[in-house]
Curated annotation (Swiss-Prot):
UniProt KW keywords: ATP synthesis, Cell membrane, CF(0), Hydrogen ion transport, Ion transport, Membrane, Transmembrane, Transmembrane helix, Transport
Species per Swiss-Prot/TrEMBL record: Rubrobacter xylanophilus (strain DSM 9941 / JCM 11954 / NBRC 16129 / PRD-1)
Record PANTHER family: ATP SYNTHASE SUBUNIT B, ATP SYNTHASE SUBUNIT B', CHLOROPLASTIC
One example GO MF annotation: proton-transporting ATP synthase activity, rotational mechanism
Pfam families assigned to the protein according to its UniProt record, in alphabetical order: ATP-synt_B
Transmembrane segments: 9-29
Subunit comment: F-type ATPases have 2 components, F(1) - the catalytic core - and F(0) - the membrane proton channel. F(1) has five subunits: alpha(3), beta(3), gamma(1), delta(1), epsilon(1). F(0) has three main subunits: a(1), b(2) and c(10-14). The alpha and beta chains form an alternating ring which encloses part of the gamma chain. F(1) is attached to F(0) by a central stalk formed by the gamma and epsilon chains, while a peripheral stalk is formed by the delta and b chains.
Listed name of the protein: ATP synthase subunit b
This protein's GO CC annotations: plasma membrane; proton-transporting ATP synthase complex
Amino acid sequence: MDPTGIFDLPNTSLIFWEVVTFLILLALLYRYVYPIIRDQIQKRQAQIEQAIEEAEKTRAEARELLEEYRRQIEAARGEARQILDEARRQAKAQRERAREEAREEGDRIIQRAREEISRERDAALREVRREVADMVIMASSRVIGRELDAAEHERLINEALESLEAEVAGGRTA
């Protein structure tokens, strides 16, 4: 056992001076080192806060840009839809015009063909009339044995033509 005390404590004067030295060291650290550390921590905190603010600004700008790009993309899609719709309308109108022109051309061709057929039929009828008239004149000259005058020729021709037209008209309706 130690003669200085019950709990074997070291010399109290030594403890006292250790505590005083520790407090002086703390005071010196607080006075000279702590402000430097505090300033460095505050600077670092300010830098971090500034970086966070800049990151938030950048994020906000990125969101705005993203929204702007989305609006532009949607506008471009709308414009593309309008262009496609207009192209479809124009193609449909062009097809309709082509159909109408083809229909009109077909009608014109049919009309020209009908007119040509009518002209050919009229020419054929005139030719038939002329030949019939010639045959009637020859036949009547032989039957009568004499030449007919112009009025008699005209009368016989008209009778033959009326007979022929009646037969042709009867053939058309049958």
